[in-house]
Structures are given as structure tokens and as C-alpha cells.
Amino acid sequence: MKIPANILLAAVALCLCGCVDCGAFRDLDYADRAELPRLDALALDSDGSAIYGQVLVPSSKFERPRPCAIICHGFAGFTRWDDVAHDLCRAGIVVVTPHHRGAWGSEGDYTVSGCIRDAENLAAWAMSQETSSKYGIDPQAVYLVGHSMGGNSVVNAAARDVRIRGVALIAPCDIGYMAERMTKKNLTAFLVGEGLHVLHRKSDEAVVDDILANACAMRFVNAAKSVGGRKVFLATGDYDSVVPSEPLDALWRLLPYDPKRHVRMRYRADHSLMGVRRALAHALAGFILEK
């Protein structure tokens, strides 16, 4: 039996009301092997570098076409989002979890501007006729989701490609704002402290110089006009000590008042959003499934 989108959204709403293990987030009963969800390997050429990851495909019980969420990791990628990805897949969303160029086995040299290009290329791939047909993706319902530096990747990628339906920013890092307020030495120290050494890169200085060269262009406020007419989800932790809140508040003030398309969530959590992941997943699924 196919699950219509309106019934699915109602189930998500029930979850949001407090029943965290019900509705769209429960594991289904599969009477036939053909109904099973599946995990596919991702190997996508992004400007000449192969980026690897996974594609989580919902059960065939969910109606086609389905929305797609591409989850971009932060810097340097230690904080995983597999739990949220699987919850979104259980709700009938195709989920792509890539590793950026130069990170966690993907080819190429890591740069922040390269991550933006990866997000652009991933969105274009998801919206292509071949991919959308293979996975049952609605090419008009592709969302970019980014945590921390991944937020920088997705908001800037969405600003460049108006076909992207919406963005979800989870404790996003406006690295352009931060770079404009730090010395090169302090910016380098910040990145080293966050795990720069685990990334494949030409040099530490190359990563820092890339940020400094693109700092102004990457500022979140510069993306507000482009993304403001689309769906925007912003989630932050009250105890976040990694990224400043000022540029996030500035972005939010620039978005037109539209509570149906623009969703602001605050959680009693730190930068990783640990401890509130289930509530976050429910809110994010509701945001993506809302027409």
C-alpha cells in the first residue's frame, strides 16, 4: 500500500506533538522484499574529484515522487548525522549523505569554496532526469541541509541555484563573518582546533587563504535576498559555544515574515545538537514534507 503525502504529513505532526516513536518514524512491516528501503553507494564527480557517500532510499510503500534532502557535514566532519538521515528516510524522504572533497576518503583537496561547489553539484545531480527517475525524487523538492560549516555550504549553493526548493541550516557557521573578525593566525588556530589536520589539503594556509579570499561573498546576509523567497529552516542550540549567533540573527531578520516557509527552532543543546536529535528530525521532516 502506498502512503499518500497528506497522511504522511499528519503522522509527522503527531510525532511533533510528543509521541516520538510513532507515525512516520516507526519501522514499517515489509511483506515483500521489493518494499524494503535500501542504501546505495554514492560516487559523484564534483569538478574532477570523486566524492563518496550514501543514498538512503525509502520503502516503495511511499508514493513517488518524493522530496530529497542532501545533508552536508561540517568542519571537519566528525559530527555525524546518520541518525537524522535515517529518521528522514523513514518519513519517506530520499536522503543523500556525501563526504566533501578532501574529507573522509573523498578525492581532491579540501577547501570551503570547494564544499559550496560540491553542494551545487550534488543538487544538480539529484535534480537530473536520470537520478530523479532512479530514486523517485521530485526535482522540484530538493533540499540542502547543512550543519556548522555545512550550513555555509548549503546557503551559498542555494543562493547560486534557484531550483533548490529550500535550505535547512543546523547550527550553521557563517565563516565569512568570523573570518572578517579574526586575524589570519587566529582563524588558522580555530580551524586546527576543529580538526583541520584530518582533511586532505594542499596546506593549512591554502584552506585559510581560500576562506579569506571568499569571506565577503560567503556572508549569510548576502544570500538572504536569494533564499528568502524559498523555504528556510534554521535550528540552533542555546549552549552553542562554537559559532556566533549574531550573523544568524542578522540573516533571520532579513527574511520576509512567512511562518509557513521560514521555520526557526531553538533547542537547549550545544553545537552538535546531541540530546535533541529526535525532536530536530521530526521538525525537519515536517518542514521538508510541508508543501
Predicted regions and their residues:
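N-terminal cap/lid segment of alpha/beta-hydrolase-fold proteins
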Residues: 22-62
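Alpha/beta-hydrolase active-site loop
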Residues: 110-136
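Alpha/beta-hydrolase fold nucleophile elbow
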Residues: 134-148
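Hydrolase active-site cap/lid region
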Residues: 156-207
